[in-house]
């Protein structure tokens, strides 16, 4: 319910308690669950880009969980709000209820760009830190000539920022809102898997504070200091990486995100701040 004007979305007991319509809604959802609960890998989202009342999603979350329990299934639930501002009160309806929603979906952050996009995600990460939950971005928007005025580059940047910031999952949204699995999307995913072959991404955390001489949106870093550093450059540039308190030598390996292929290699030694410059402009 994007505009949330349709009575269909006000039927639950704590709303308008429309028992006539609710009976059919429950039968429909129960029929869907007859099929989906046969499988253990299904994630359940109560709505798509909703502006609905909190009671609407809460009712269906309880309904799904109860039916799952009857089948001996543990299910994982969330709600997807339409507000592009992740700091908005509406998102707290999910963030503040880990007993109801097992993970969060912050896809609407993908309407934002650059440093703001990164900072918003980290805000949610910190907000959830007392009771961490997976943060998914099921819809990565960004494709040339889409209805939002985005570009292909926007989609690639959003994917990689979320990857280094700690998202549990990222997916390029379907064309024309996103790249889908076109050549650029596939290359970016391949590059991410190549990075993962070197650095388990769950072993590093956002660490832009280790970067120096950095402009907004110039480079992004996730690190396990002294062990591994994963850096993303959206459009070339040059920054310093603070290795002053670190001993030893590190292998520097570049991945060309445009092609999903390995790039040049080098060595870095600890004990100082080291300049890092990607091989060319573009996504590295």
Where are these regions (language model features)?
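Active-site mouth of glycoside hydrolases
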Residues: 1-100, 114
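Aromatic- and carboxylate-lined catalytic core of secreted/periplasmic carbohydrate-active enzymes
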Residues: 134, 142-146, 151-266, 275-284
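Structural recognition of alpha->loop->beta junctions
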Residues: 93-104, 160-169
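Active-site-proximal beta-strand/loop segments in catalytic clefts of secreted hydrolases
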Residues: 46-49, 80-83, 106-110, 138-142, ...
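Amphipathic alpha-helical segments in well-structured domains
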Residues: 29, 57, 61, 121, ...
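Proline-centered loop/turn at the N-terminus of a beta-strand
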Residues: 43, 74-76, 132-135, 168
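Active-site clefts of carbohydrate-active enzymes
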Residues: 50, 88, 101-109, 118-153, ...
């Amino acid at each position: 319910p994007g505009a949330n004007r349709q009575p269909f979305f006000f039927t639950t007991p704590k709303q308008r308690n429309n028992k006539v319509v609710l009976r059919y809604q429950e039968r429909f959802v129960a029929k869907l669950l007859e099929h989906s609960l046969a499988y253990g890998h299904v994630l359940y989202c109560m709505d798509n880009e909703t502006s609905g009342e909190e009671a609407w999603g809460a009712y269906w979350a309880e309904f799904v969980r109860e039916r799952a329990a009857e089948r001996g299934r543990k299910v994982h639930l969330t709600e997807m709000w339409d507000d592009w501002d992740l700091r908005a009160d509406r998102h707290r309806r999910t963030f503040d209820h880990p007993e109801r929603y097992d993970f969060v979906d912050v896809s609407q952050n993908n309407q934002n760009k650059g440093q703001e996009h990164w900072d918003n995600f980290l805000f949610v990460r910190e907000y959830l830190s007392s009771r961490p939950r997976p943060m998914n971005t099921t819809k990565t928007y960004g494709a040339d000539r889409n209805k939002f005025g985005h570009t292909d580059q926007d989609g690639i940047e959003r994917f990689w920022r979320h990857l280094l910031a700690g998202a549990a999952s990222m997916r390029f949204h379907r064309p024309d809102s996103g790249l889908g699995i076109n050549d650029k999307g596939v290359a970016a995913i391949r590059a991410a898997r190549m990075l993962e072959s070197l650095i388990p991404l769950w072993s590093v955390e956002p660490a832009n504070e280790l970067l120096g001489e950095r402009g907004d949106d110039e480079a992004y870093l996730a690190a396990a200091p002294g062990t591994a550093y994963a850096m993303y450059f959206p459009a070339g540039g040059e920054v310093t990486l603070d290795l002053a308190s670190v001993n030893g030598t590190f292998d520097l390996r570049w991945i060309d995100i445009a092609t999903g292929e390995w790039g040049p290699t080098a060595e870095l030694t600890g004990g100082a701040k080291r300049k890092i410059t990607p091989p060319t402009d573009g996504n590295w």
